[in-house]
């Protein structure tokens, strides 16, 4: 059994251009009749497994809110009664969507998530953990009645036809689960709260288009490097403000300007790339960036490598250990050990911040 709750603040958060959504998932050890293995024997911070499930839910529900809805919103989900034959990760999205659907939050769902595995030639929806061990294809997909929102998983060299069939099989179940949520909403759903109408300025938007579009096109077609391109695009924004009538600067809305400019820049660059079949750095759409690889880049670690693709670099190390170095995975359903650990770090300087 899964408990899902959804709460949103009554007032929108001012001065932001993103949706402040928080999704948390936790598997209570009591759900499986277990005591946590930590020193204090209390529930601790979210495990990597729980964080990954949070991301699955977040990616599925985040697009389903109005663009101008910026109220703080929390979706908290707990496993409160476990079943060793059921993987909860494929049900968490359904629970979150159901909670949002019957709440007063302006959620434009419902959505649902299911796991689909190909086992001995058959496509099975939400297989048991034991069944999934023999899967040659194993995916989680999220969707609405009309569309697929997200697909994530793994396979052993699955064909494109198998992947499409798995998605079709899962979507049939998603449609049924969405219809069930709609019925639930009609029976006990709360009236949806009103969403604040965003302030718009059609005259300012047109001025931004007239001044910026041609300049953005020139930058997009110049086959420049990332840093030079970023500098020139930033200069376009500065030039617009510098050329804005001085008598109107007192009422100039910088937030609206940034909103309009970002939308226009995105749409203009997308149109240029699609029409010309050339990427921003001059590559064709089917041409990859230059690759460079170097092994043993560091003298002391057991192994290391430097991988470079264009302006993107990854420095990796590998450490070998004995069985005593295995990672203990203390989940609600069972205690297990992991002999391969992949740790990923993305510090702020990676993007120049």
List where the protein language model places each region.
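Alpha/propeptide regions of enzymes that mature by internal proteolysis
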Residues: 18, 23, 44-66, 70-76, ...
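Glycine-rich, flexible beta-strand/loop modules in the N-terminal catalytic cores of phosphate-handling
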Residues: 1-86, 145, 152, 302-353
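Mobile "lid/hinge" segments at catalytic clefts and subdomain interfaces of large enzymes
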Residues: 104-224
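A generic local secondary-structure boundary/capping motif
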Residues: 10-12, 61-66, 101-104, 113, ...
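Short beta-strand-initiation
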Residues: 18, 109-111, 134-136, 286, ...
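Conserved mixed alpha/beta core segments that line enzyme active sites in large multi-domain catalysts
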Residues: 79, 83-88, 97, 110-117, ...
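Extended amphipathic alpha-helical scaffolds
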Residues: 1-9, 13, 196-336
């Amino acid at each position: 059994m899964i408990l899902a709750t959804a709460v949103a603040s009554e007032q929108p958060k001012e001065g932001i251009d993103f949706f402040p959504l928080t999704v948390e998932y936790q598997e209570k050890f009591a759900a499986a009749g277990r005591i946590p293995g930590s020193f204090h024997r209390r529930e601790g911070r979210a495990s990597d497994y729980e964080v990954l499930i949070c991301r699955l839910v977040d990616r599925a529900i985040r697009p389903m809110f109005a663009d101008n809805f910026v109220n703080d919103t929390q979706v908290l989900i707990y496993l409160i009664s476990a079943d060793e034959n059921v993987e909860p990760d494929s049900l968490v999205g359904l629970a979150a969507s159901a909670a949002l659907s019957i709440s007063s939050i302006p959620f434009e769902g419902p959505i649902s998530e299911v796991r689909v595995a190909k086992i001995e030639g058959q496509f099975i929806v939400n297989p048991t953990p034991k069944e999934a061990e023999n899967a040659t294809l194993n995916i989680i997909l999220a969707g609405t009645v009309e569309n697929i929102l997200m697909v994530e998983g793994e396979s052993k060299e699955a064909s494109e036809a198998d992947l499409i069939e798995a998605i079709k099989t899962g979507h049939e179940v998603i449609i049924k689960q969405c219809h069930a949520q709609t019925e639930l909403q009609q029976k006990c759903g709360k009236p949806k709260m009103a969403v604040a109408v965003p302030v718009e300025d059609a005259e300012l938007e047109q001025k931004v288009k007239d001044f910026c579009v041609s300049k953005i096109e020139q930058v997009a077609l110049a086959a420049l490097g990332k840093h030079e391109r970023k500098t020139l695009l930033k200069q376009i924004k500065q030039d617009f403000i510098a050329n804005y009538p001085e008598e109107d600067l007192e009422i100039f809305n910088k937030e609206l300007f940034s909103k309009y400019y970002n939308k226009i820049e995105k749409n203009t660059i997308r149109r240029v790339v699609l029409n010309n079949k050339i990427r921003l750095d001059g590559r064709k759409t089917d041409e990859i960036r230059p690759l460079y690889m170097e092994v043993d880049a560091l003298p002391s670690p057991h192994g290391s490598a430097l991988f470079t693709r264009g302006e993107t670099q990854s420095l990796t190390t590998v450490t070998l250990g004995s069985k005593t170095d295995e990672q203990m995975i203390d989940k609600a359903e069972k205690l297990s050990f992991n002999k391969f650990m992949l740790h990923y770090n993305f510090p702020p300087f990676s993007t120049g911040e």
